From Swiss-Prot:
Keyword annotations from UniProtKB, A to Z: Amidation, Amphibian defense peptide, Secreted
Intracellular or extracellular location(s): Secreted
Annotated positions of the Leucine amide modification: L14
Identification of the protein by name: Fallaxidin-3.1.1
Keyword Secreted: yes
Coiled-coil positions: none
Length: 14
């Protein structure tokens, strides 16, 4: 799963 990557992507946007 790429949940971690998804979370990192969202955090990077913020």
């Amino acid at each position: 799963l790429d949940l971690a990557k998804h979370v990192i992507g969202i955090a990077s946007k913020l």
